Amino acid sequence: MAPNPPKGTSSRAWDAVTPPLSEWVLEAMSSMGFARMTPVQASAIPLFMAHKDVVVEAVTGSGKTLSFLLPIVEKLLRLEEPIKKHHIGAIIISPTRELASQIHSVMQSLLAFHPPSAAAMTPLDDDDAPRQKFPSSTLKVVPQLLLGGSTTPAEDLSRFLKLSPNVLVSTPGRLLELLSSPHVHCPQSSFEMLVLDEADRLLDLGFKETLQNILRRLPKQRRTGLFSASVSEAVDQIVRVGLRNPVKIMVKVKGTSGVDDKRTPASLQMTYLSTPPLHKFAALKNILSSVQPTPQKSIFFVSTCSGVDYLSAILPLLLGDDFLLIPLHGKHQANVRQKNFNRFLSSHSPAILLTTDVASRGLDIPSVDLVVQIDPPSDPKTFIHRCGRAGRAGRRGLSVVMLHPGREEDYVSFLDVRKTPVVPFSPSISFSDADATSATARARKAVLADRALHDRGQKAFVSWLRSYSKHQASSIFRVADLDWEALGKAWGLLKLPKMPELRSFTGDKTLGVSLDWDNFSYKDKQREKRRKELLQEAAESGVSQPSSNKRRASESVAWSQNAENKNKKLQRREYKKLKQEKTKWENMTEEERQKARETKEMVEELRAKNLEERRFRQAAAKAETAKAGGEDEEFKGFD
């Protein structure tokens, strides 16, 4: 147990906060190993507890989560009376499922030290769990996690009605669905605090409309906190969120010059490595072997989901058996993402998370030693978020961004201007053509064993190029400067894919590979059978073999056949769903059946209300359009 510092000896002591924190909170901080507050916590907690709106910009890994969790908990536990049933006291909005899950987990760990709240959080379906009884007038905090993909809106509503939480931790879309229910209440009399975590990302175009709809359902008289690593880049939109004279807190890190010139933790060393394209993936093993001690948790960032899918099959061949490589990207199913994320967290052997920017923001992954940006991010703002996965909470960390020699090295000066300085990777790494050739051979051996991996590689290379061409620092990352043959060989490709960018390329598009493509087969027997059938049809008709991609394959099937297959699939799915519901219903008690009926009625009522609102908005929009165009003459057609 981490000892508490003597009372009053430091402005960052937990017991020095004004207004003071509860005794059980002080005990929780000590038991959880937080000896004193971080600078951002020391600045934000007193203001947020003193009924101020706050805008907090601080480096990643600086302890922002507790900066809003503690004020929320303290506020709800100091009310004159408990919040009414099915009324909300606070909402925390997160841009990603993973971040929302982590915030909820931290809150549960904190509330475990508050007996009434801990008792209220006992799982509803755990009838055997001992449940301590408290009077109904006892103040407590009950959080509920809302995530799209893991549960349905109906299940979330059902759990809300049973649990009656007073704090919601959610992603924007699922939160809006729940708040649309007439059974969920956020009146001014009960609602206290709203937190937007990773605020700049929430205010992006993708969440803007959803966020505005949420805010319309919340009372204006509330306390609001915006927390992020780069709030300043979204300042123009903060006013729309509805803060009232917010206090802006900016916590920076002093550089070696003593000036506040860094936007990342001082414990994080940020470096760059200039590698020729042919040696890029081979150099990864050299990076891992040169870092001492051996990194136990590493994160490799690439630019696209397709890149993760392909490289997750190739990189283990180049890195050897010493590291467990785990893929994670935004197009994975929610259960796959959670499973892979948990595998990485719980791994006891050296592990590498191969991921996209889905893991660059907010995720509190403990003990990350190394971050390698195989692909520099298209948006320079993302650079510090990627780096910040390492060096969290004062722990030492190393970040490496890989650049091609030449113009890409100007990225170093570009980052320096943005107050994100990087230095050359040390110790220096030597590159040999023999290592690069060996890496290419191993990758190609795997690709030759299964045509599916070849298809995956072609798709990944094209998607990587599209991402590269859209880099915001386009004067530094130029498609015209790319060495196509070296890149293709480094990726282990058997040929360069057909792309508009290669129309003027006069080099060897086969990459020196001679292959009988007609006999290049899939490991999957059904897929290979289908390929041979298409090949036979092409030979008989005198037409060249169609492409193996899904689009061409689907064109060879009659539309009516596709429609029939789709209908059969939908029927099977519906039959399976009905069968599962019947089995579930038969296993229910009469009380459970009654609750299920009530929930169904509530959901149907909610859907009807949403449909009515949608029709009203459409009618209003139509009327507005008609009004705006009422003076226009009717189009008579062309002469």
Curated annotation (Swiss-Prot):
<dbReference type="Pfam" id="PF00271">
    <property type="entry name" value="Helicase_C"/>
</dbReference>
<dbReference type="Pfam" id="PF23681">
    <property type="entry name" value="CTT_SPB4"/>
</dbReference>
<dbReference type="InterPro" id="IPR001650">
    <property type="entry name" value="Helicase_C-like"/>
</dbReference>
<keyword id="KW-0539">Nucleus</keyword>
<dbReference type="Pfam" id="PF00270">
    <property type="entry name" value="DEAD"/>
</dbReference>
<feature type="coiled-coil region">
    <location>
        <begin position="561"/>
        <end position="624"/>
    </location>
</feature>
<feature type="short sequence motif" description="Q motif">
    <location>
        <begin position="14"/>
        <end position="42"/>
    </location>
</feature>
<keyword id="KW-0547">Nucleotide-binding</keyword>
<keyword id="KW-0175">Coiled coil</keyword>
<dbReference type="GO" id="GO:1902626">
    <property type="term" value="P:assembly of large subunit precursor of preribosome"/>
</dbReference>
<feature type="domain" description="Helicase C-terminal">
    <location>
        <begin position="283"/>
        <end position="437"/>
    </location>
</feature>
<feature type="region of interest" description="Disordered">
    <location>
        <begin position="620"/>
        <end position="639"/>
    </location>
</feature>
<keyword id="KW-0694">RNA-binding</keyword>
<feature type="short sequence motif" description="DEAD box">
    <location>
        <begin position="197"/>
        <end position="200"/>
    </location>
</feature>
<feature type="domain" description="Helicase ATP-binding">
    <location>
        <begin position="45"/>
        <end position="249"/>
    </location>
</feature>
<dbReference type="InterPro" id="IPR025313">
    <property type="entry name" value="SPB4-like_CTE"/>
</dbReference>
<dbReference type="InterPro" id="IPR014014">
    <property type="entry name" value="RNA_helicase_DEAD_Q_motif"/>
</dbReference>
<dbReference type="InterPro" id="IPR000629">
    <property type="entry name" value="RNA-helicase_DEAD-box_CS"/>
</dbReference>
<comment type="function">
    <text>ATP-binding RNA helicase involved in the biogenesis of 60S ribosomal subunits. Binds 90S pre-ribosomal particles and dissociates from pre-60S ribosomal particles after processing of 27SB pre-rRNA. Required for the normal formation of 18S rRNA through the processing of pre-rRNAs at sites A0, A1 and A2, and the normal formation of 25S and 5.8S rRNAs through the processing of pre-rRNAs at sites C1 and C2.</text>
</comment>
<protein>
    <recommendedName>
        <fullName>ATP-dependent rRNA helicase spb4</fullName>
        <ecNumber>3.6.4.13</ecNumber>
    </recommendedName>
</protein>
<dbReference type="Pfam" id="PF13959">
    <property type="entry name" value="CTE_SPB4"/>
</dbReference>
<dbReference type="InterPro" id="IPR011545">
    <property type="entry name" value="DEAD/DEAH_box_helicase_dom"/>
</dbReference>
<dbReference type="GO" id="GO:0016887">
    <property type="term" value="F:ATP hydrolysis activity"/>
</dbReference>
<comment type="subunit">
    <text>Component of pre-60S ribosomal complexes.</text>
</comment>
<dbReference type="InterPro" id="IPR056330">
    <property type="entry name" value="CTT_SPB4"/>
</dbReference>
<keyword id="KW-0378">Hydrolase</keyword>
<dbReference type="GO" id="GO:0005654">
    <property type="term" value="C:nucleoplasm"/>
</dbReference>
<dbReference type="GO" id="GO:0000470">
    <property type="term" value="P:maturation of LSU-rRNA"/>
</dbReference>
<dbReference type="InterPro" id="IPR014001">
    <property type="entry name" value="Helicase_ATP-bd"/>
</dbReference>
<dbReference type="InterPro" id="IPR027417">
    <property type="entry name" value="P-loop_NTPase"/>
</dbReference>
<feature type="region of interest" description="Disordered">
    <location>
        <begin position="531"/>
        <end position="601"/>
    </location>
</feature>
<feature type="binding site">
    <location>
        <begin position="58"/>
        <end position="65"/>
    </location>
    <ligand>
        <name>ATP</name>
    </ligand>
</feature>
<keyword id="KW-0698">rRNA processing</keyword>
<feature type="compositionally biased region" description="Basic and acidic residues">
    <location>
        <begin position="577"/>
        <end position="601"/>
    </location>
</feature>
<keyword id="KW-0067">ATP-binding</keyword>
<dbReference type="GO" id="GO:0030687">
    <property type="term" value="C:preribosome, large subunit precursor"/>
</dbReference>
<keyword id="KW-0690">Ribosome biogenesis</keyword>
<dbReference type="GO" id="GO:0003724">
    <property type="term" value="F:RNA helicase activity"/>
</dbReference>
<comment type="similarity">
    <text>Belongs to the DEAD box helicase family. DDX55/SPB4 subfamily.</text>
</comment>
<keyword id="KW-0347">Helicase</keyword>
<dbReference type="GO" id="GO:0003723">
    <property type="term" value="F:RNA binding"/>
</dbReference>
<dbReference type="GO" id="GO:0030686">
    <property type="term" value="C:90S preribosome"/>
</dbReference>
